[in-house]
Amino acid sequence: AGMVAQPIAMDEQSLLSMIDRRVELANTDDANSSRLLLLILDGITDPRNLGACIRSAASMGVDAIIVPKDKSAPLNEAASKTASGGASLVPVVSVVNLARCIGQLQKRQVWVVGTLLETEQMLHQVDMQDNIAIVMGSEGKGIRQKTAKCCDFLVKIPMVNADLGFNVSVAAGIALYEVQKQRRY
């Protein structure tokens, strides 16, 4: 059996310091290269789904993944294996209070975009050129109401058969791709 990549843990204070540095950079330097992309996972309890989200995040250049301490999958071997090396590329930040953390992001010029099934605005209709945090919820329940209330935008991913829906890692990949598409192409 091969070695499983060790996940990078980062605390909330280190995350906020990193964001402060990046926002400062964006004001002086080439704004394109210093724009933030964060992924917030609200209530993802299956380690394999967590791992698959980490893999999608790593593929799409996410700077950090934020998860709540409670009701969140452990970053265990199953998660790391599913992440296929992505766990060593993207820090995972476990926070005590997700709503408060989102508020801290917003104070630092990060737009927070929540994904829901039942909302009017489509993912591609939001301008994602600035610092962005994408919020994904659990497949069963979606993002919590308290989390949704904190978001700057609530969007849905257009689907042909919406009653089937996507696995959360697939939905995360689509949302992150949309950010990169708007920024790069």
Language-model segments: which ranges?
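Conserved beta/loop motifs at nucleotide-recognition and modification sites
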Residues: 9-10
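Structured adenosyl-cofactor binding patch, chiefly the S-adenosyl-L-methionine
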Residues: 2, 59, 64, 74, ...
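RNA substrate-binding interface of SAM-dependent RNA methyltransferases
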Residues: 1-3, 20-122
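Acidic-enriched and Gly/Ser
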Residues: 14-15
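Active-site/ligand-binding-proximal alpha/beta "capping" segment
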Residues: 113-168
